[in-house]
């Protein structure tokens, strides 16, 4: 299973058990964006502008 990760923003193989890709962005002036692999989707927080969780290779591009 592969997902895009930050800070490199390249597709990488996820560790065993982490079969969800995610992307989240903050409500900040800089528009910080984090991408990677997780075992379960993080909970949405009010400081997030955007949260995506998906189960298809590289779906968080």
From Swiss-Prot:
Matching entries from Pfam families are given as:
Toxin_cobra-type
GO MF annotation list = toxin activity
Gene3D superfamilies linked: CD59 (2.10.60.10)
Q: What cellular-component terms does GO give this entry?
A: extracellular region
Tissue specificity of this protein: Expressed by the venom gland.
Q: Write down the species.
A: Naja haje haje
Q: What's the superkingdom here?
A: Eukaryota
Q: Which cysteines are joined by disulfide bonds?
A: 3-21, 14-37, 41-53, 54-59
Q: Where in the cell is it found?
A: Secreted
**The protein's name:** Weak toxin CM-2
- Which family would the database say this protein is a member of? Belongs to the three-finger toxin family. Short-chain subfamily. Orphan group VI sub-subfamily.
Major subcellular site: secreted
* Keyword entries, A-Z: Disulfide bond, Secreted, Toxin
């Amino acid at each position: 299973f592969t997902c895009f990760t930050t800070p490199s923003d390249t597709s990488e193989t996820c560790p065993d058990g982490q079969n969800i890709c995610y992307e989240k962005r903050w409500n900040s002036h800089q528009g910080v964006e984090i991408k990677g692999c997780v075992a379960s989707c993080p909970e949405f927080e009010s400081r997030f502008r955007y949260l995506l969780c998906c189960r298809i290779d590289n779906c968080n591009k």
